[in-house]
């Protein structure tokens, strides 16, 4: 997500087709709270460990991430949307010329593919056991910005 923040704030981010692609994610502090909650409640006392999926519920869409970043940064950005074929063509072209010179660039083919695929994870264990989230997406970003302001420049 830190790369997404940088891309949005530097106006290097583009939607690839569907704005509503779900991207599972969770704030690190929320993950720590959830682990502590699972250990404290010991809902499965007979088990030595509990394995669970962790994500916000529901997983935010890529558009919700971008809007939350803009909100927390107090900036209103227009984020263009391009068909994936155009972005892939650009990315492959940039990669072709940049790779021999070992130049880093923000148009990674792998990252574009990641934006297209939904990785919507349902935190079933937490839902079934009524876990109460401490942070919304915007609250998580605000807290992150407060703790790490350099990542929001």
Feature-to-residue mapping (PLM):
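Short, surface-exposed alpha-helical segments at coil->helix boundaries
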Residues: 2, 63, 120-124
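Short aromatic-enriched loop/helix-cap "lid" or pocket-rim segments at secondary-structure transitions
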Residues: 1-3, 64-67, 91-94
């Amino acid at each position: 997500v830190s790369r997404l923040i940088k891309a949005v704030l530097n106006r290097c981010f583009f939607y690839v087709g569907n704005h509503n692609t779900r991207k599972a994610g969770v704030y690190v502090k929320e993950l720590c709270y959830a682990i502590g909650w699972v250990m404290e409640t010991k809902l499965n006392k007979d088990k030595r460990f509990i394995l669970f999926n962790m994500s916000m519920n529901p997983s935010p869409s890529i558009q919700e991430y971008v809007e939350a970043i803009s909100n927390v940064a107090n900036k209103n950005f227009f984020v263009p949307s391009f068909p994936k074929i155009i972005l892939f063509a650009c990315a492959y072209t940039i990669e072709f010329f940049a790779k021999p010179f070992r130049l880093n660039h923000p148009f990674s083919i792998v990252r574009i593919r990641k934006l297209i695929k939904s990785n919507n994870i349902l935190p079933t264990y937490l839902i079934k056991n009524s876990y109460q989230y401490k942070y919304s997406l915007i609250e998580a970003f605000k807290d992150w910005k407060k703790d790490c302001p350099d990542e929001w420049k």
